[in-house]
Swiss-Prot record:
Gene (name only): ATP6
Entry GO CC: mitochondrial inner membrane; proton-transporting ATP synthase complex
Role description: Mitochondrial membrane ATP synthase (F(1)F(0) ATP synthase or Complex V) produces ATP from ADP in the presence of a proton gradient across the membrane which is generated by electron transport complexes of the respiratory chain. F-type ATPases consist of two structural domains, F(1) - containing the extramembraneous catalytic core and F(0) - containing the membrane proton channel, linked together by a central stalk and a peripheral stalk. During catalysis, ATP synthesis in the catalytic domain of F(1) is coupled via a rotary mechanism of the central stalk subunits to proton translocation.
Localization terms from the record: Mitochondrion inner membrane
PANTHER family attached to this UniProt entry: ATP SYNTHASE SUBUNIT A (PTHR11410:SF0)
Organism of derivation: Lumbricus terrestris (Common earthworm)
Subunit structure comment from the entry: F-type ATPases have 2 components, CF(1) - the catalytic core - and CF(0) - the membrane proton channel. CF(1) has five subunits: alpha(3), beta(3), gamma(1), delta(1), epsilon(1). CF(0) has three main subunits: a, b and c.
Protein name (record): ATP synthase subunit a
GO molecular function annotation: proton-transporting ATP synthase activity, rotational mechanism
Length: 231
C-alpha cells in the first residue's frame, strides 16, 4: 500500500514488484523497442513517412532550420519516439514514470540545447552574439534587452525540461487521487464508484493525448531553438 500520492514517483516503492531498478527497466525497454523498430532498419528516405507519427515529426522538422543542420533530425526524431513510449508506459499501473522526473527530462533537453549553442558560436560568433539584441530597439534599452534575451536563452533547457516533468507529474497525481477515491467508494456507494470509474477512464484517455502532445511539444521547442542558429 502506498503511503501518499507521491509514492508513484519513488522507484524504490516498486522493488517488491520489479526486482531490477525501475528506471533501468523502463529506459532500456524503450531503447530495445527503438532498436528493433523497422524504422531504423529500412532505408531512411523510404520509411520516414510510412506512418502518421513519422510524417508529423518530420514535417515539423522541415519547417525549421533543422534541415540545414546535419545530424540534428535523427536525434530529435529518436527523442520524440522514445518520449512517446516512455510517457505511455508511465500510465501503466505500477510502472515507474521516468518522464516525470526533472533529471531525466533535463538529460534530454540540455545536451541538444548546449550542442546548438556551441555549434552556432563556433560557426559565427558575431552573428550568434547579434541574436541577443532585437532589431529596431532604442539605444537606451539595448543593455536591458541584451540582459533579458541572454537570460531567456540560458533558461531554455530548464523551462523545457520542467514543462514536460510538471505536466506528466500532474497527470499521475490526479490519477492517483482518482484511484484512492475509487477504492474508498467501492465499499460505500455503487453509483459513486461507477461515476468515478467512468471519470477515470475519460481522464486516462485524456492523459494518453497529453503524453503524445507533450512529447511533440518537447521536440517542437528543440527544433525551434535551431532557428537561432547562425547560417
Amino acid at each position: 500500500m502506498m503511503p501518499d500520492i507521491f509514492s508513484s514517483f519513488d522507484p524504490y516503492m516498486f522493488n517488491t514488484l520489479f526486482p531490477l531498478n525501475s528506471l533501468f527497466l523502463v529506459t532500456n525497454t524503450a531503447i530495445i523497442l527503438m532498436i528493433q523498430s523497422s524504422f531504423w532498419v529500412l532505408n531512411a528516405r523510404t520509411s520516414a513517412f510510412k506512418s502518421p507519427v513519422n510524417d508529423t515529426i518530420f514535417t515539423q522538422l522541415s519547417r525549421t532550420s533543422t534541415t540545414h543542420l546535419k545530424g540534428l533530425s535523427t536525434p530529435l526524431s529518436t527523442i520524440f519516439f522514445m518520449l512517446v513510449m516512455i510517457n505511455l508506459m508511465g500510465l501503466i499501473p505500477y510502472m515507474f514514470s521516468t518522464s516525470s522526473h526533472l533529471v531525466f527530462t533535463l538529460s534530454l533537453g540540455f545536451p541538444i540545447w548546449l550542442s546548438l549553442m556551441i555549434s552556432t558560436f563556433a560557426h559565427s560568433p558575431k552573428k550568434s552574439t547579434a541574436h541577443f539584441l532585437p532589431d529596431g530597439a532604442p539605444d537606451w534599452l539595448n543593455p536591458f534587452l541584451v540582459l533579458i534575451e541572454t537570460t531567456s536563452v540560458f533558461v531554455r533547457p530548464l523551462t523545457l525540461s520542467f514543462r514536460l516533468a510538471a505536466n506528466m507529474s500532474a497527470g499521475h497525481i490526479v490519477l492517483s487521487l482518482m484511484g484512492i477515491y475509487c477504492a474508498a467508494a467501492w465499499f460505500s456507494s455503487v453509483s459513486s464508484t461507477a461515476l468515478l470509474i467512468l471519470t477515470a477512464i475519460g481522464y486516462i484517455l485524456f492523459e494518453v493525448a497529453i503524453c503524445l502532445i507533450q512529447a511533440y511539444i518537447f521536440c517542437l521547442l528543440l527544433s525551434l531553438y535551431s532557428d537561432d542558429h547562425a547560417h
